[in-house]
Amino acid sequence: MRNLNFVTILAATGIAALSALVLGAPPLQAQESTGAAAHIENYYRELMPTIRQAGRLSVRERDKRFAPAITAAFDLATMTRLAVGPPWRSFSPAQQAAVREAFSRFIVADYASQINDYSGESFVVDPQTIPEARGGGEIVKTKLVQPSGRIVNINYLVRGGRVVDVYLNGTISDLATRRDEFASIIASGGADGLIKRLQERSQGLLDR
């Protein structure tokens, strides 16, 4: 699995100490996960059949297969609003709906374009969650373990039973990164400019 970005990688220091679910490898003796951690375990379970076949599938085929799992696991409406930031309030209802649609399509296409190979990686989910400092959510810690032993930590912020942000390497907010990127697009082209850019990027990814 190469070029992972949106939901990414990890490697194996102290994995045996985790009460965890491992997907893509024989299961460890594990504490049963509930709530937010179980939600992420189920998300990974849904992804794994397609990930294992990634090298034999086109980007469009992966996009089609990933879409149900991603849209079920992620609160894409909330993520869209948070990624846009303060300008969201200035968008008309029609523009908000169009941005939500374009952003959701882009997220799935982006993931499908990056998961392009599988060589024995496995996901690990820690059943012990961390309460969010504010907002009432929970942080779910996960790892994607490569055969080489490399680990990259991926934390998920779950509110109301669905993911609202992803922290790459445990600390880098995916939404904060996108908000910075979107700010210049919105400043020059407004909501319509953002919609156009997201649609173009999705199309470009799917055409690879």
Which stretches of residues belong to each language-model region?
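Surface-exposed, charged secondary-structure patches
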Residues: 108-154, 201-208
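Sec/Tat signal peptide C-region and signal peptidase I cleavage site
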Residues: 24-30
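Short beta-strand edge/turn micro-motifs at domain boundaries
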Residues: 151-180
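Early exported N-terminus immediately downstream of N-terminal targeting peptides
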Residues: 32-111
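Bacterial N-terminal signal peptides
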Residues: 10-22
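Positively charged n-region of N-terminal signal peptides that target proteins for export
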Residues: 1-4
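A mature extracytoplasmic/lumenal domain signature
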Residues: 103, 129, 143-146, 156-158, ...
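Non-transmembrane domains of secretory- and envelope-associated proteins
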Residues: 171-208
